[in-house]
Swiss-Prot record:
One of its GO terms (molecular function) is chitin synthase activity. Residues 176-188 have a biased composition (Low complexity). It is found in: Cell membrane. It comes from Cryptococcus neoformans var. grubii serotype A (strain H99 / ATCC 208821 / CBS 10515 / FGSC 9487). This is Chitin synthase 8. The chain crosses the membrane at residues 728-748, 762-782, 796-816, 842-862, 870-890, 972-992, 995-1015.
Length: 1032
């Protein structure tokens, strides 16, 4: 099964959500005791336009809806409870009476003729589309042509559905308080997979005019390729989403709209798709009451709807929309607005003004408001449903784990009410359609609800809120959960424009965070799956130590089933790199109290620690400066620095004025993520990492004085000074890594030359090959994209891997030769061993470095990466220097954010505006009259008729910025290569053919590396001791 798959359709339904012919109305059990029949109101009855005698569309009603003696008594329904049948349902039941409330006819018929109230789940509004008489499947219409009003037009209309419902609906009321009533323990058993859906259930609020603004235009979930596995029916009826039996609407939807048959003057339907014959009988002679008209639309289709007047909620367009009954019937809790309605808010302001402009979220509307302890954000761009389901499953497991901690003062069975999951999609037109379908299947998104413009203001974000009760299993299958499933409060923010991840975080922190005021914020990327209890361990670090302002866990490479992914050397090398970083680097920095980077893919922050002070200065202000680093006035240093904006946030948090926050590493928390498995992906990813980390490290070193404005103790400040020296030394080594590696290669090959002249015939060609590969990398990096030069980059990495194998052979050969020389001189002693330069400078230093790797891995009880990934890392490590570093510095000018031309306001969703006499009301404006359509068309022709202005070619600001960045790139690259070349020349040529200086330098270099490894080992050991007593 692919992620996103839903459980098989319930009994009596096909794969598209439609009831089968053989079981259109299956007998239902008696889940409730029988009650008396509801009183029957005067009702209307329509004739059948599909009959052979029909000459026109439905018109005047016949006031006779009572059951006839010839009709068997079927099911009747309790109007107060839409899901409660009163008596068994037969294949043909009596008509469900309509309310007596009448409205003015939409087509200008005499007002004296009463019209039935509109069907509340999205009935068509055109004059040809009279109201649904009832949810049952057989609807009778008046077939007498004499009943047609004089002005009735029998030709199909090609305009938008018309009609205006003047009833004013109030905004969504304050949600009822559920904190004390609903709990996990009171949730009944989940709905079994084989439950029978009754296709004749009337929808909630049937005949209730107060909800018509929602139900007349019930959203249609339209996709390029609707997938029945998500529970998305392929019906083109807007009502088929929530009421399976309420899809038998007859309306003129306009030319070519969804392929629905249109009615001609003789009462027959134009068979647009060959599904019907126009007389109510299908091609096979069977009754067509459940026939689907039209193919799957390849675009977002237009819905039949009525112009509505909707009162604004606190000045904003806020809608509460019924969720589909197909979804609700799979949920154990079916009462309460948070479970039965999805809340939509059209946000027209900047994220920083969200609270100031009086926008709010559901959690603040309860009485008392719900307190949010954990606020989890999942940022995504265009990732597919597989990655999203993986992340969402991990989050659901963690929330379920929190609800099982019955002894906790914070969590327990109602712990899900203290967690809000926020999903931020970067661009409405960029989101993956299948991921959007997953969100719709969970209930937190519905197509066709959003608007582009509200009262002249462009919508910046579409916010959907819903508490889902569905779950995602290990295979990515969506459906009812088991006994461990708990509700999940979900907040889906669909940004109108693509403005990158840092803008998504601004929505999370400055808009939603400012509204909910959470305690701990957890950051996740789509594709990263936290462990089943990892989020709890992250939260526990904040709960134990009040001075912890940020924390992170271990990032684990996805190994696949039976660790098959480790067969790829790229994945294995990254697995070793991640493991050693989590064993040595992160524990060391955690002991210091300052972790240079909390990965944005899996980290957590205390919300109050990130807030700015009264003057507006603080971590969040500096963090979001990076969002403006794509303008023409941005400097290249700042632009590259904010490629690693999470490093900036960490430094600003530790050095916050008059505070003493520290960062902590939580070994018990882990998250699994995909790592690049191809060379182009790895090269592109590391370019951003290397450039961002390098310039961010320079920023923290240059602004180290900020530390003195904090309230850290003298001891903590001294320890941070030690870490400053350590980080500076690491940065110097990273800068000269290119030259140092070549020196190591030269020393090893020259040492072999001293053992015999035959080695020269191998070493001299290898030197030329090394230089040629390096130059090849420079040429590729300056003019070729990794994705477009996959063979070139891959061949370079393979070439450096072969050179590394030769260097390993040389090191082992020299080690053995050194031991033989010492043994030949006499007894093997320590002084004799250290007296041999080659053995002392090369072998011992390398053994010390990698020996510490093995010891620290054993102490951490994680030795397996040394067995499965160590050798692959040794082969790929030279490419980290000679390929990845070269590409990063050659493209230091590439800081584009990809948002050029994104200032255009889309209008494909439509706009709403306030009425002239009441600013608190908005109406949906649709072109109806043919003259309006012609006027728009004439305006377009006039634009084409005008002569185009002469184009004047000028150099744009973007071009000037690009030229400036390229010049800086050239200068940085020149300085980097010249300094590394000067180092090589000084070390190799200063002694005039004698290799003693090069050998000595090599020994100092290797012992320095061993010393740094030992320093990291001490920090890792200290962390393990502290963790032992901290109770993590």
């Amino acid at each position: 099964m692919r992620p996103g798959d839903i459980y098989p359709p319930p009994q009596g339904y096909n794969a598209y959500g439609s009831p089968t012919r053989q079981n259109q109305r299956p007998p239902q059990p008696q889940p409730y005791p029988p009650q008396p029949y509801p009183p029957q109101q005067p009702a209307v009855q329509y004739g059948d336009p599909f009959s052979a005698s029909s000459q026109g569309p439905p018109t005047a009603p016949l006031h006779n809806m009572s059951p006839t003696p010839q009709e068997p008594q079927g099911s009747r329904y309790n109007a107060s409870h839409p899901l409660q049948p009163i008596s068994p349902s037969g294949p043909q039941g009596p008509r469900y009476s309509l309310p007596t409330q009448s409205l003015s006819p939409f087509n200008g018929s005499p007002a004296s003729a009463p019209a039935p109230a509109p069907y509340t789940m999205g009935s068509p509004s055109h004059s040809n589309a009279r109201m649904h008489a009832s949810p049952p499947q057989h609807i009778r219409f008046d077939t007498n042509p004499s009943h047609l009003p004089p002005q009735q037009q029998l030709t199909p209309s090609y305009s938008y559905p018309s009609g205006l419902d003047d009833r004013l609906t109030s905004p969504p009321p304050l949600l009822p308080h559920h904190s004390s009533q609903s709990s996990v323990s009171s949730i009944p058993a989940p709905v079994p997979d084989n439950i029978n859906y009754n296709p004749s259930y009337p929808p909630q609020g049937y005949g209730n005019a107060a909800d018509d603004d929602m139900n007349d235009s019930h959203p249609l979930l339209a996709h390029a390729a609707p997938d029945a596995r998500f529970g998305i029916p392929q019906s083109t009826s807007a009502m088929s989403m929530s009421a399976p039996a309420a899809r038998y609407q007859l309306s003129d939807t306009g030319a070519g709209d969804m392929g629905v048959s249109m009615y001609t003057g003789n009462g027959n339907a134009e068979g647009q798709n060959g599904f019907g014959t126009g007389d109510g009988v299908g091609a096979n002679g069977e009754d067509e009451v459940n026939m689907h008209y039209g193919p799957i639309p390849a675009r977002m289709v237009r819905r039949n709807r009525t112009q509505k007047r909707v009162q604004l909620f606190q000045g904003h367009l806020v809608l509460d929309i019924e969720v589909p009954t197909m979804l609700l019937d799979q949920c154990p809790i079916r009462q309460g607005n948070e479970f039965t309605k999805m809340r939509y808010t059209a946000v027209t302001c900047d994220p920083n003004d969200f609270v100031e402009d009086r926008y709010t979220l559901r959690q603040r509307l309860y009485d008392p408001p719900r307190q949010t302890e954990l606020f989890i954000v999942i940022t995504m761009y265009n990732e597919d449903d597989v990655l999203f389901c993986r992340t969402m499953r991990g989050v659901m497991q963690n929330i379920a784990h929190l609800c099982t901690r019955s002894k906790s003062k914070t969590w327990g069975e109602n712990g899900w009410k203290k967690v809000v999951v926020c999903i931020v999609a970067d661009g409405r037109k960029k989101i993956n359609p299948r991921t959007r379908s997953v969100l719709a299947a969970l209930g937190v998104y519905q197509e066709g609800v959003g608007k582009n413009i509200i009262n002249g203001k462009p919508v910046t974000a579409h916010v959907y809120e819903y508490t889902t009760q569905l779950s995602i299993n290990s295979s990515g299958k969506i459906g009812p959960g088991g006994s461990n499933t708990v509700p999940i409060q979900m907040l889906f923010c669909l940004k109108e424009k693509n403005q990158k991840k840092i803008n998504s975080h601004r929505w999370f922190f400055n808009a939603f965070g400012a509204c909910l005021r959470p305690n701990v914020c957890v950051l996740l990327d789509v594709g990263t799956q936290p462990g089943p209890d990892s989020i709890y361990h992250l939260w526990k670090a904040f709960d134990i130590n009040s001075s912890v302002g940020g924390a992170c866990g271990e990032i684990v490479a996805l190994k696949g089933m039976f660790w098959k992914n480790l067969l790829n050397p790229l994945v294995a090398a990254q697995n070793f790199e991640y493991k050693m970083s989590n064993i040595l680097d992160k524990p060391l920095e955690s002991v210091f109290g300052y972790i240079t980077v909390l990965p944005g893919a899996f980290s957590a922050y205390r919300y109050i620690a990130l807030l700015n002070d009264e003057k507006g200065n603080g971590p969040l202000k500096q963090y979001f400066v990076g969002e403006r680093m794509h303008g023409s006035g941005a400097g290249i240093f700042s632009s590259n620095m904010y490629l690693a904006e999470d490093r900036i946030l960490c430094w600003e948090l530790v050095s916050k004025r008059e505070c003493k926050w520290k960062l902590h590493y939580v070994k018990s928390a882990y998250a699994i993520t995909d790592v690049p498995d191809t060379v182009p992906e790895l090269v592109s990813q590391r370019r951003r990492w290397l450039n961002g980390s390098f310039f961010a490290a320079i920023h923290s070193i240059v602004h180290f004085g900020y530390l003195y404005r904090s309230s850290h103790t003298f001891t903590r400040k001294f320890i941070l000074h030690v870490e400053l020296v350590y980080q500076t030394l690491n940065m110097v080594f990273a800068w000269f890594a290119l030259g140092n590696y070549y020196i190591a290669f030269f020393v090893l090959t020259q040492s072999l030359n001293s053992l015999g002249s035959a080695w020269k015939y191998v070493n001299i060609p290898l030197h030329y090959i090394y230089i040629a590969l390096l130059l090849w990398c420079f040429l590729l990096s300056l003019g070729n994209r990794p994705a477009g030069s996959k063979i070139g980059y891959t061949s370079s990495m393979v070439g450096f891997a072969l050179i590394t194998i030769y260097m390993l052979f040389a090191a082992i050969f020299l080690a053995v030769k050194g031991i033989e020389d010492v043994q030949a001189e006499g007894e093997i002693t320590a002084s004799a061993v250290f007296g041999n330069k080659i053995f002392r400078n090369i072998v011992i230093s390398l053994l010390a470095t990698y020996g510490l790797y093995i010891i620290s891995s054993l102490m951490a009880l994680e030795p397996w990466h040394m067995i499965t990934s160590f050798f692959q890392y040794l082969l790929i490590a030279p490419s980290y220097i000679n390929v990845l570093n070269v590409y990063a510095f050659c493209n230091v000018h590439d800081v584009s954010w990809g948002t050029k031309g994104s200032d255009k306001v889309s209008d494909d969703l439509g706009a709403v505006k306030s009425s002239a006499d009441n600013k608190d009301e908005v109406t949906v404006d649709l072109p109806i009259e043919q003259k309006d359509i012609n006027a728009v068309y004439a305006a377009e022709l006039q634009i084409l008729g005008n002569k185009a202005p002469k184009e004047v070619r000028v150099v744009s600001d973007d071009q000037k910025q690009e030229d400036y960045y390229k010049n800086v790139r050239t200068n940085v690259l020149l300085v980097w290569t010249m300094t590394n070349g000067a180092l090589v020349a000084v070390i190799l040529q200063a002694s005039g053919g004698d290799n003693s200086l090069a050998t000595t330098y090599m020994g100092v270099l290797l012992y320095t590396v061993a010393g740094l490894a030992f320093f990291r080992f001490l920090g890792s050991s200290t962390y393990l001791v502290v963790r032992l007593f901290a109770g993590e």
